[in-house]
């Protein structure tokens, strides 16, 4: 729940970068937020008090290497992945972003419309949650039925 609740502040800070990149690099625009979800899950597990106290945690993650290398920073430094895992996670995120992009385009929304904007935000939110879920699973967390 903590990582999900952070979506509003993460999403608001991500939006200018995501929108700027969408026309030229739509899979980057969609995929990078999945990496951010993964980072947030990792930070929740390791240092949530510091991460939660950072009102602009997305900007903090982005600014270390810049937007274009946010993925590499998260995979290398935040998650500490080796080259093999780095490649596997990058391929997974790329596949997810491409599938979401295909679904988004299939909707036939008018580019620049309010409806298209809302759909884009919904896609980002779901990819953020997917990143969070992937990382929690990688760390060994799993759902257990209670009762």
What are these regions (language model features)?
Residues 1-147:
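Intrinsic-disorder/low-complexity detector
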